[in-house]
Amino acid sequence: DFIQTNTKADIVDINMGCPVNKVVKNEAGAKWLKDPDKIYHIVKEVTSVLDIPLTVKMRTGWSDSDLAVENALAAESAGVSALAMHGRTREQMYTGHCDHETLARVAKAITKIPFIGNGDVRSVQDAKLMIEELGVDAVMVGRAAMNNPYIFTQINHFFETGEELPELPFDKKLDIAEDHLKRLVDL
């Protein structure tokens, strides 16, 4: 109720994927991935008091991906509006590679809500692979946007036209960075 009364939020997102120790030691973030029932009850409780959409981001699991589908289905059946999954376990943190096989299994299992694939989306081709081969409904770009904030334009352009945009010239990248800095200062 606080969120809807005191903010202008259009959506609430629960991050069940945060792998850092200071979060998981407090029984939060990726720690919840060990217990699909807990995921269900948390999502059910939050959706019962919200009039705006609730989304969840999670990882494929804690130390393995055995519960990935079960965790995703728990969130879906509890009423989440969309689910994003990072294709690494908590144990992996940010190392290794995105587990495409697990994301594809979850994409097949989730049928009532949009499923968003995340992890190693560094290019238009990575986004295309996730959508066309893994079956996700959308992609979430993470750390790759720090090196290439233009990636969102590139991906959108590709899916709208079927054409890849050329790499931005360095001076254009500097102009964009300067614009972002000015906007940050204006906040």
Model-derived segments and spans:
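Active-site entrance/lid segments in N-terminal catalytic domains of soluble metabolic enzymes
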Residues: 1-69, 73-76
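Glycine-rich tight-turn/loop motif centered on a GG-T
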Residues: 21-39, 88-100, 161-166
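Non-cysteine beta-strand/loop elements that form the S-adenosyl-L-methionine
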Residues: 11-20, 77-88, 141-145
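Alpha/beta catalytic cores of nucleotide-metabolism and tRNA/nucleoside-modifying enzymes
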Residues: 41, 49-51, 65-82, 94, ...
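Active-site beta-loop-alpha junctions enriched in small/polar residues
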Residues: 17-19, 57-63, 88-90, 120-122, ...
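Short glycine/serine/threonine-biased micro-segments
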Residues: 11, 15, 27, 59, ...
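Short, functionally important structural connectors and interaction interfaces within domains
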Residues: 8, 25-26, 86, 90, ...
